[in-house]
UniProtKB/Swiss-Prot annotation:
This is Large ribosomal subunit protein uL22. NCBIfam families: rplV_bact (TIGR01044). SUPFAM superfamilies: Ribosomal protein L22. It comes from Fervidobacterium nodosum (strain ATCC 35602 / DSM 5306 / Rt17-B1). This protein binds specifically to 23S rRNA; its binding is stimulated by other ribosomal proteins, e.g. L4, L17, and L20. It is important during the early stages of 50S assembly. It makes multiple contacts with different domains of the 23S rRNA in the assembled 50S subunit and ribosome. The lineage of its organism: Bacteria, Thermotogati, Thermotogota, Thermotogae, Thermotogales. It comes from the Bacteria. Keywords: Ribonucleoprotein, Ribosomal protein, RNA-binding, rRNA-binding.
């Protein structure tokens, strides 16, 4: 059971307070994008995500563009959003960006009934995913490590 924190008259759970802190502590050379409640199985999305991890953004876009998987189109849009966040919000150059981290978490499951013989029924779980892509500027990251 979550405890409720009262902040400025609003009720917020501990999760929301912690999430706000983690968003504020992102480095200045890092941007991220999250697609939540995507109607694709996490297992199917992970195969696509693993292929772009650690690659330059342009190379990752090429891999996703020519992939025939459904998850590739979704991950392409999330990556595009992360790059837009980096260029517009942080002023980073797209040429120096690379996919620093990307992962897929399980979302909620929609349960459906599939009628079977003799009056029985099976439950089908339609899975959802939360897809996160984090991009970093390679040059600015090296500058901060050198200091």
């Amino acid at each position: 059971m979550q405890t409720i924190i009262k902040r400025e008259g609003l009720k917020r759970s501990k999760f929301h307070a912690k999430r706000k802190e983690t968003l504020a502590t992102l480095p200045k050379y890092e941007a991220r994008a999250v697609a939540r409640f995507v109607r694709i199985s996490p297992r199917k999305a992970r195969s696509v995500i693993n292929s772009i991890r650690g690659k330059n953004v342009s190379e990752a876009f090429n891999l996703l563009e020519f992939s025939s998987k459904k998850a590739a189109r979704i991950v392409y849009n999330v990556l595009k959003s992360a790059v837009a966040n980096a260029t517009n919000n942080l002023g980073l150059s797209e040429e120096n960006l690379y996919v620093a981290a990307c992962y897929v978490n399980d979302g909620p499951r929609m349960k459906r009934v599939w009628p079977r013989g003799r009056g029985r029924a099976d439950i089908i779980q339609k899975r959802m995913s939360h897809i996160t892509v984090i991009v970093r500027d390679r040059e600015k990251e090296n500058e901060t490590k050198a200091k």
